[in-house]
Swiss-Prot record:
It holds the Pfam family Anth_synt_I_N. Its cofactor is Mg(2+). Its EC number is 4.1.3.27. Belongs to the anthranilate synthase component I family. This is Anthranilate synthase component 1. Mg(2+) binds at residues 335, 472. GO terms for biological process: L-tryptophan biosynthetic process. Feedback inhibited by tryptophan.
C-alpha cells in the first residue's frame, strides 16, 4: 500500500489501516518467529493440525499487544501499556465486547491473509452467566482469580504460510497520529530486521527420557467424591431432570519450566486442530484442543461436536479394529447423536430457517493418542446477527455441559467444588472483518504462580460406571502431564 492509498482509506473513515510486507521465511518456523518477535507479555502463537494428522497452512504469531480488555464478573477493565484507562460495571459484558471491537474500523485489504488482526484471547466458561438468568451467580470459589474474559487488541501480527514457506507481517497504523504511514513502515522495517537475527537455541528435549514419568498432582475431587458425584448425576438422569451431564475435575501440579517449553512438548505429543500459547503476563494459557466451539467465516456458522473415544492402536490394523469397535458401541453412538441434535439446535438459534445442515456425520478423526467420532454442523448466519451472537448462543459447548444444557449446568454448579474459569470456555479470535474462530478450552493448561492447572471431565449418562468415569478424567490429562515431564527437562 502506498501513501496515497493509505490517505484515501483514512479519508473514508477508517481509524486503523493495515500495512504489510511479505517475505520468504523458509529457514524459520512459527516457534522461532515467535521467539524473535513476540516473546513478551500479551503475545500469542496459534497453530493447527487438520484432522489430527496434517499441519494447517497458516500459523499466527501475535506481537505484544498494547491494549488489553479484561472482565471480572461484571466489571470491565481496559489497560493500555499496562496502565488501566477504563474501569466500570457492565450488565452485559458480551454486548460490550461487540461495542469495544467497533471502536476499531479496519478496512479489508486485498491480498492479505484471512486473519490480519482482531481481538484475541478467551471467553471463560462462566460467560454463560451473562446470558442465562438461572445461572447468573456461581456458588463456587475461584482460587485462580483470572478474568472471565481476556481479549488483547492484536494490532501487529505475523502470519506464517507453512505451505509456501513465507510470511505476511501486518501492523495497524492509526491515521490520526502524525506521520502515521511513515511510522507504520518503519515498524515493518524493524520487524524485518529482527527476523534476520538468529535466536539463542533452546535446550533440546529428550522424548525418551519423558516416557513413563508422571508428576504427582492434587485434584479438586477425591476419587470417592468424584464417583459419588457421578452417582448423583445418574440419580438426576433417572428422575428425568436431564439426559447427560459433563462434570470435570481440576488437577494441579508444581511447574518450574518455561511455559514455551510446555508448548513445544505439547505440539510434539498431541498436535490438534487448535494449538495455542498465550502469555498474559501474570499467567499463561497453553493448550492443544481438538474441538471447535464455533467458527463464523463469511456468514457460515460451524460447530463440530466430538464425542466417542478410543485409544490409538499399535498399527493400522489395530486402528481399524478400534474404529469399528467405537462405531458399533451403542452408548457412544447414542451420546454422539444427542450432541449432533444439540449442535443443530444451537446453530439454528442464529441461522436462517432451513439452512442448518449436518455436512459430516460420525466420521473418525485420529490424533496422536486417541481417535474420536466427529460430526460437522453448519448454518447460514441470519441477517442482522454477528459472530458474537453466535458465540452467545453456543457457549459453552454441549460436550462440556450436557443436555438439556441449562439444567446440566445447574447440576455442574451444584457438584463441582471450584469455578471452571478458562476450562470449557472459548479460546481464539474475533477478526476485524467479522469472522471468528474459537476452540473449546480443553486439554489446556493454566500456569500461574509456579503451578500448572489442567481440567478434564466426561459425559455421564444413565449407564455410566463411576469408577470408569474417574479413570477417564485421569486418562485425558495424560498427554498434558507427559508434556510437562518433557518440558521440565529444561530446568533439570
Amino acid at each position: 500500500m502506498n501513501r496515497e492509498e493509505f490517505l484515501r482509506l483514512a479519508a473514508d473513515g477508517y481509524n486503523r489501516i493495515p500495512l504489510s510486507f511479505e517475505t520468504l521465511a523458509d529457514f524459520d518456523t512459527p516457534l522461532s518467529i515467535y521467539l524473535k518477535l513476540a516473546d513478551a507479555p500479551n503475545s500469542y502463537l496459534l497453530e493447527s493440525v487438520q484432522g489430527g494428522e496434517k499441519w494447517g497452512r497458516y500459523s499466527i504469531i501475535g506481537l505484544p499487544c498494547r491494549t488489553v480488555l479484561r472482565v471480572y464478573d461484571h466489571q470491565v477493565r481496559i489497560s493500555i501499556d499496562g496502565v488501566e484507562t477504563e474501569r466500570f460495571d457492565c450488565a452485559d459484558p458480551l454486548a460490550f465486547v461487540e461495542e469495544f471491537k467497533a471502536r476499531y474500523q479496519v478496512p479489508t485489504v486485498p491480498g492479505l491473509p484471512r486473519f490480519d488482526g482482531g481481538l484475541v484471547g478467551y471467553f471463560g466458561y462462566d460467560c454463560v452467566r451473562y446470558v442465562e438468568k438461572r445461572l447468573a451467580t456461581c456458588p463456587n470459589p475461584d482460587p485462580l482469580g483470572n478474568p472471565d474474559i481476556l481479549l488483547m487488541v492484536s494490532d501487529a501480527v505475523v502470519v506464517f504460510d507453512n505451505l509456501a514457506g513465507k510470511i505476511h507481517a501486518i501492523v495497524l497504523a492509526d491515521p490520526s497520529e502524525e506521520n502515521a504511514y511513515e511510522r507504520g513502515q518503519a515498524r515493518l522495517e524493524e520487524l524485518l530486521e529482527r527476523l534476520r537475527q538468529p535466536i539463542t537455541p533452546r535446550r533440546g528435549l529428550d522424548l525418551e527420557a519423558a516416557q513413563g514419568r508422571e508428576p504427582a498432582f492434587r485434584a479438586s475431587f477425591t476419587r470417592e467424591d468424584y464417583e459419588n458425584a457421578v452417582g448423583r448425576i445418574k440419580d438426576y438422569i433417572l428422575a428425568g431432570d436431564c439426559m447427560q451431564v459433563v462434570p470435570s475435575q481440576r488437577m494441579s501440579i508444581e511447574f518450574k519450566a518455561a511455559p514455551i517449553d510446555l508448548y513445544r512438548a505439547l505440539r510434539c505429543f498431541n498436535p490438534t486442530p487448535y494449538m495455542y500459547f498465550f502469555n498474559f503476563g501474570d499467567f499463561h494459557v497453553v493448550g492443544s484442543s481438538p474441538e471447535v466451539l464455533v467458527r463464523v467465516e463469511d456468514g457460515l456458522v460451524t460447530v463440530r461436536p466430538i464425542a466417542g473415544t478410543r485409544p490409538r492402536g499399535i498399527n493400522e490394523e489395530a486402528d481399524l479394529a478400534l474404529e469399528q469397535d467405537l462405531l458399533s458401541d451403542a452408548k457412544e453412538i447414542a451420546e454422539h447423536l444427542m450432541l449432533i441434535d444439540l449442535g443443530r439446535n444451537d446453530v439454528g438459534r442464529v441461522s436462517d430457517i432451513g439452512a442448518v445442515k449436518v455436512t459430516e456425520k460420525m466420521v473418525i478423526e485420529r490424533y496422536s493418542n486417541v481417535m474420536h467420532i466427529v460430526s460437522n454442523v453448519t448454518g447460514q448466519l441470519r441477517e442482522g446477527l454477528s459472530a458474537m451472537d453466535a458465540l452467545r448462543a453456543i457457549l459453552p459447548a454441549g460436550t462440556l455441559s450436557g443436555a438439556p444444557k441449562i439444567r446440566a449446568m445447574e447440576i455442574i454448579d451444584e457438584l463441582e467444588p471450584v469455578k471452571r474459569g478458562v476450562y470449557g470456555g472459548a479460546v481464539g479470535y474475533l477478526a476485524w472483518n467479522g469472522n471468528m474462530d474459537t476452540a473449546i478450552a480443553i486439554r489446556t493448561a493454566v500456569i500461574k504462580n509456579g503451578e500448572l492447572h489442567v481440567q478434564a471431565g466426561g459425559g455421564i449418562v444413565a449407564d455410566s460406571v463411576p469408577a470408569l468415569e474417574w479413570e477417564e478424567t485421569i486418562n485425558k490429562r495424560r498427554a498434558m502431564f507427559r508434556a510437562v515431564a518433557l518440558a521440565e527437562q529444561s530446568v533439570e
